[in-house]
Amino acid sequence: MKRIFRLVRRCHYSTEKRTNGPLVLVSNNQNIHFNLSLENFLLNNYNDLLKYLNINTIEKFNEPILFLWRNNRSIIIGKNQNIWSECNLKNIKEDGVLVARRFTGGGAVYHDLGNVCFTFLNNNINTSSNFLIILNTLKNHFNIEAKTQGRNDITVNDQKCSGSAFKKIKDVFLHHGTILINLEKNILNKYLTPDKIKYIKHGVSSVNARTINLSEINNNITCENLCIALIKEFTKFYEQNYKENINNIKNLENNINNSNFQNKEQININNTNENNLINNTNIIPNDITVHYIDQNNNITKNPEFLKYYNLLKDWDWCYGKTPKFQNHIWKQFTFGKLELFFNVSNGFIKDGNIFSDCLDINLIDHLKSIFNNDIKYSKEDISIFFKKLNVENKNYLDEVRSWILQEL
């Protein structure tokens, strides 16, 4: 893509600027570790976000956020996945593809400059509203009839064009995902080696067969005009409270290509690709609250951001150690695959781990507690352990309990 998406402006910080209302944030960096760190920082500092954006206010923030970003070639795996079985690490290393383990659940995905990443943040569970914004974007601006499928996918003609994952911290909800525009689908199988059992039930043989680029449906769609459309629909969705945004957002297309921004390296991030999704511009009207963030922003100098960034780059976090365990069981459930490794020492369950692409990371975290609570390797004690677990998805827990007890 040769065109440069110039969407955001420098914010002029003053008490006169409107500080309430939905925010649109865009990352001017294409490094996966940078963007995941930024996303996690926004999630954990949601209520204090205005001060980190240098807006002169004492208000606590509690409005919807749309965060748009894009990455160079990267493999991103779910928090609880086994990277050794999900990825072809030899090919990944040879081609210089970055690998990251995100902070949310779900499966392994491939990113490049042919897809747009979105993040919705809110203090309410608004997944249905978020999906509606995306569906309206595709229908109203590109004449693409898409639909939700399951809990986390958007499909066109029964092929997946978007996948999502979710996370909650305190009273803040995160919904993030990707939208495939012109992804290099032909190399998905080069880097990803997902369990074939996922595709047997779909009657297909590869990741490629299940996914579709939106450019295959409408060849006029690009990452840049999709983002403009998303901002329009996001603002339109909340127009009852913020009508002034709609009156001014029409100026976006006319002013997109007016200026450039030259990035400067600050924290040793390789972001030299010229095909930037966004560049700084001063042309968006002041009453549209859009902020750009790059590696020169104050947020990226914050110790908490740097902690996330260094963690994501850490080998132990990303790859982890998968020792040879005495016991290995796995099963594909409707909510995801579970793979358990554990040792039994002196009749007790020890030294284990659970790998999963399940979106409910709280369920997996609770299940992992079996490895550090001196649980006897017996049906009775394991059954008692499961009864004490306090999780939201009781049905999922019952399925896992029945399976493990059957495997003993």
UniProtKB/Swiss-Prot annotation:
Binding residue positions for ATP: 102, 107, 110, 160
The way its activity is modulated is described as:
Inhibited by the lipoate analog 8-bromo-octanoate (BrO). Catalytic activity is increased in the presence of Mg(2+).
Q: Where is the signal peptide?
A: none
Q: Where primarily located? A: mitochondrion
Q: Which Pfam families match?
A: Lip_prot_lig_C, LplA-B_cat
UniProtKB keywords: ATP-binding, Ligase, Magnesium, Metal-binding, Mitochondrion, Nucleotide-binding, Transit peptide
Q: Which GO terms fall under biological process for this protein?
A: lipid metabolic process; protein lipoylation
Q: Which residues cross the membrane?
A: none
Q: Which GO terms describe its cellular component?
A: cytoplasm; mitochondrion
Q: Where in the cell is it found?
A: Mitochondrion
Pathway the protein acts in: Protein modification; protein lipoylation via exogenous pathway; protein N(6)-(lipoyl)lysine from lipoate: step 1/2; Protein modification; protein lipoylation via exogenous pathway; protein N(6)-(lipoyl)lysine from lipoate: step 2/2
Residues recorded as binding (R)-lipoate, renumbered to this chain, are 107, 160
Catalysed transformations (reactions): L-lysyl-[lipoyl-carrier protein] + (R)-lipoate + ATP = N(6)-[(R)-lipoyl]-L-lysyl-[lipoyl-carrier protein] + AMP + diphosphate + H(+); (R)-dihydrolipoate + L-lysyl-[lipoyl-carrier protein] + ATP = N(6)-[(R)-dihydrolipoyl]-L-lysyl-[lipoyl-carrier protein] + AMP + diphosphate + H(+); (R)-dihydrolipoate + ATP + H(+) = N(6)-[(R)-dihydrolipoyl]-5'-AMP + diphosphate; N(6)-[(R)-dihydrolipoyl]-5'-AMP + L-lysyl-[lipoyl-carrier protein] = N(6)-[(R)-dihydrolipoyl]-L-lysyl-[lipoyl-carrier protein] + AMP + 2 H(+)
Q: What is its EC number?
A: 6.3.1.20
- Transit peptide limits: 1-18
Entry's family note:
Belongs to the LplA family.
State the protein's purpose.
Catalyzes both the ATP-dependent activation of exogenously supplied lipoate to lipoyl-AMP and the transfer of the activated lipoyl onto the lipoyl domains of lipoate-dependent enzymes. In the mitochondrion, functions as a redox switch between two lipoylation routes. Senses the oxidation state of lipoate and determines which downstream enzymes will be lipoylated. In low reducing conditions, uses lipoate in its oxidized ring form to lipoylate glycine cleavage system H-protein GCVH.
PANTHER family given in the database record: LIPOATE-PROTEIN LIGASE, LIPOYLTRANSFERASE 1, MITOCHONDRIAL
UniProt-recorded name of the protein: Lipoate--protein ligase 1
- Give the organism the record lists: Plasmodium falciparum (isolate 3D7)
